[in-house]
Amino acid sequence: MSLDINQIALHQLIKRDEQNLELVLRDSLLEPTTTVVEMVAELHRVYSAKNKAYGLFNEESELAQALRLQRQGEEDFLAFSRAATGRLRDELAKYPFADGGIVLFCHYRYLAVEYLLVTVLNNLSSMRVNENLDINPTHYLDINHADIVARIDLTEWETNPQSTRYLTFLKGRVGRKVADFFMDFLGASEGLNAKAQNRGLLQAVDDFTAEAQLDKAERQNVRQQVYSYCNEQLQAGEEIELESLSKELSGVSEVSFSEFTAEKGYELEESFPADRSTLRQLTKYAGSGGGLTINFDAMLLGERIFWDPATDTLTIKGTPPNLREQLQRRTSGEK
């Protein structure tokens, strides 16, 4: 992994009681040892693999103002990180759920792009076996379950300040209040809505195939083409490029897909991140609720699976063998 650490600072917040968070600040930056580089590389890998929301700094963001001064050389990185950790403590103190943790600020470069990663990591206890096969207590940073994380694309922020996507953060699973406090600390608001872009893409694909008057099999082939392209981009860590996708769909219609989306006003960005859960809808139908979970390939609708919208009834012809065996065992046992 081509990852180079420029500067990295580590501080700590310790929860002493319900009202107080103690601040423990380092007096020096961490040295980028092999262990430190491996830790940051793991953080980068874990964070990059998660679904993220996109945002931008508010005009009054204290963090953005301090970061700008630091980037201009008016404040060193350690002082910037110490002051920011103090603001984080003050923001956390407003919430009853506030916990401590290890606060990390890392300025690093990956594939010619500069980033600032800010995260609060849990320092957990565990056990280890030493060389004498004795069991001893140990501590570790819970990187895999980190949920308070934000990353600023410094290159994008400085070269394209009007962007709505230079800041990314995790949202959803950690809860609304946790997301709120971290966004307040960052002085940021949500920008590009990647899920909405992906939903818009799916709608555009359906409308595009309908206007081209394709039959069912042809429509499904186009959806599979779109899914294959988007999934390849997702696996490669690349964004969906509307023009590239349009080339993949050349021949479907006399009008190119990119021209179609522009003319119909879908408001799709030229490029945007792929959202795995939304893209699955190109090839599958899935849903759950009320104790029922259903998942099937889209091509089966109208062939083995039929939906009657009037009665909201789904009819399945031919059940999977393992399900059929379970049903047979259960029904035979009840006779």
UniProtKB/Swiss-Prot annotation:
<protein>
    <recommendedName>
        <fullName>Nucleoid-associated protein YejK</fullName>
    </recommendedName>
</protein>
<dbReference type="Pfam" id="PF04245">
    <property type="entry name" value="NA37"/>
</dbReference>
<dbReference type="GO" id="GO:0003690">
    <property type="term" value="F:double-stranded DNA binding"/>
</dbReference>
<dbReference type="GO" id="GO:0005737">
    <property type="term" value="C:cytoplasm"/>
</dbReference>
<dbReference type="GO" id="GO:0043590">
    <property type="term" value="C:bacterial nucleoid"/>
</dbReference>
<comment type="similarity">
    <text>Belongs to the YejK family.</text>
</comment>
<dbReference type="InterPro" id="IPR007358">
    <property type="entry name" value="Nucleoid_associated_NdpA"/>
</dbReference>
<keyword id="KW-0963">Cytoplasm</keyword>
<dbReference type="GO" id="GO:0003727">
    <property type="term" value="F:single-stranded RNA binding"/>
</dbReference>
